[in-house]
Swiss-Prot record:
Gene Ontology molecular function: toxin activity
Superkingdom of this protein's organism: Eukaryota
Protein name stated in the entry: Toxin To31
Keywords associated with the record: Secreted, Toxin
Native organism: Tityus obscurus (Amazonian scorpion)
Amino acid sequence: CSTCLDKP
């Protein structure tokens, strides 16, 4: 993820 608090 780019705008999330995730890795992808």
